[in-house]
């Protein structure tokens, strides 16, 4: 009952007429949470039936009629993980005493060597060992913000209807920086099952500049936990992050990322100029090699942490520039105009130093002004398939390429596709009819939140400091 103003739990909301907690249409209460009729998935430790993993949540598998984590993984809050969260949940690094040194190359080559360290004095030099003409031009498609019905129409179109492959026959994959609020986790699970990369974009999507260590950890690692729990994805494979709204957090952000199991960050904006050669990824062992126009850029040495800079896009003049493609639209563009600046910025890398061309996309860019962004992107992708030396990789694959660079010829001869599958091998396929979880959230700006998941609904709406949606 909710006749005295009580908040409902378990994915239900208060029916103001009946004054009682109700689930979404077609749902019933099972073990105190709302479950879609016909959905019989089981949590870790519960009984299961059918082939291994077919009825289990959270990356578990069905063994001896009971859901259990695979060997080498442990149950953490209802999902299986290889991460030892106790290592970093309360860890606080000492305050470094000095700024990072300038890159010591080429005079002292032993101080920074691949695979764990890479730098150059001007930030524009590619990894050594491959002639420029043999370097592949790597292109990365990244998508920002929530994953829901609004954005999934475009994602399914791009990766189901508009099938494109790399020169070696491998399908093009993308990286999705997912934020929590308004995200549906059955859709996130579908993205992972298609072989795309998932990365963290925070829970609340609020700017975290000036936030402390605990706040950064709660937002970025918390979102990683939410995706593992409610999208049945392998938490250990979520190794990338991008700060919400590109709000840098200084040394705290990057120290937290490195110590809590993140491999790379894609937040720092770098402006090479309208015709300048763009900047290459680098580790933070040494000082950032480009001008940092933000007070919250990293200043100290963070060995092994990869920074993948967002090279600023330029329009036809110096005055139109942005790290996100949405910022390049002013309202009167045609698809041909957008294609022009996509191709112009691509050539800035392709004709000079082959630095990775990272496209920072979101649903707003694809759908604005009658969909000019989507039409331009389709045309751009079609043009890219005509280049024998252009390869589309995920961010994770880009870092792996940086750690062990390969020439165009080597990529073309690979016996397997350079892609990653982020769904746990024992996870069930994305369900056709997910559970709809509804919550009253008077303290979050919107009085009600809801999301879809193939798993059972949590007791309360997942949020910072409570990513599992538990009751206390």
Which residue ranges define each predicted feature?
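Conserved N-terminal segment of EGF-like repeats
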Residues: 1-89
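Surface-exposed, active-site-proximal loop segments in enzymatic domains
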Residues: 204-214, 323
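C-terminal regions of proteins
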Residues: 395-420, 432-434, 438
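Extended, charge-rich low-complexity interaction segments
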Residues: 417-463
């Amino acid at each position: 009952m909710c006749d005295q103003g009580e908040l409902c739990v378990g994915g239900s909301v208060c029916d103001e007429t009946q004054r009682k907690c109700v689930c979404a249409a077609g749902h019933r209460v099972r073990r105190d949470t709302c479950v879609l009729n016909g959905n019989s998935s089981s949590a870790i430790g519960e009984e299961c039936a059918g082939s291994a993993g077919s009825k289990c949540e959270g990356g578990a598998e069905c063994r001896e009629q009971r859901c259990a984590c695979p060997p080498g993984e442990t149950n953490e809050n209802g999902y299986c993980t290889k991460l030892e969260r106790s290592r970093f949940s309360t860890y606080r690094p000492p305050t470094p005493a000095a700024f990072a040194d300038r890159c010591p190359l080429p005079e002292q080559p032993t101080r920074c060597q691949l695979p764990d360290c890479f730098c150059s004095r001007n930030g524009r030099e590619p990894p050594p060992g491959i002639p420029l003409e043999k370097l592949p031009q790597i292109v990365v498609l990244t998508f920002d913000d929530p994953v829901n019905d609004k954005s999934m129409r475009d994602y399914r179109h791009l990766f189901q209807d508009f099938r494109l492959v790399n020169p070696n026959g491998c399908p093009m994959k993308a990286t999705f920086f997912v934020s929590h609020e308004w995200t549906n986790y059955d859709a996130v699970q579908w993205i992972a099952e298609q072989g795309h990369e998932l990365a963290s974009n925070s829970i609340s999507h609020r700017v975290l500049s000036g936030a402390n260590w605990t706040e950064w950890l709660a937002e970025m690692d918390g979102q990683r936990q939410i995706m593992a729990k409610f999208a049945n994805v392998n938490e250990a494979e979520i190794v990338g992050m991008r700060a919400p709204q590109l709000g840098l957090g200084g040394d705290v952000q990057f120290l937290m990322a490195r110590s809590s199991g993140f491999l790379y960050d894609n937040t720092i904006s770098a402006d090479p100029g309208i015709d300048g050669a763009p900047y290459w990824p680098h580790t933070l062992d040494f000082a950032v090699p480009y001008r940092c126009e933000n007070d919250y850029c990293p200043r100290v040495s963070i060995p092994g942490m990869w920074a993948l800079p967002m090279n600023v896009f330029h329009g036809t003049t110096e005055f139109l520039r942005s790290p996100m493609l949405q910022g390049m639209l002013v309202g009167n563009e045609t698809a041909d105009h957008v294609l022009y600046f996509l191709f112009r910025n691509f050539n800035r890398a392709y004709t000079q130093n082959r630095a990775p061309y990272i496209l920072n996309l979101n649903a707003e860019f694809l759908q604005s002004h009658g969909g000019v962004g989507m039409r331009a992107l389709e045309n751009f992708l079609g043009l890219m398939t005509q280049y024998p030396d252009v390869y589309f990789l995920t961010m994770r694959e880009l870092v792996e390429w940086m750690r062990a660079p390969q020439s165009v010829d080597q990529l073309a001869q690979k016996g397997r596709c350079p892609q990653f599958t982020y769904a746990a091998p024992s996870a069930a396929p994305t369900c056709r009819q997910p559970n709809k979880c509804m919550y009253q959230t008077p303290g979050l700006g919107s009085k009600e939140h809801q999301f879809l998941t193939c798993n059972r609904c949590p007791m309360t709406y997942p949020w910072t400091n409570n990513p599992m949606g538990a009751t206390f």
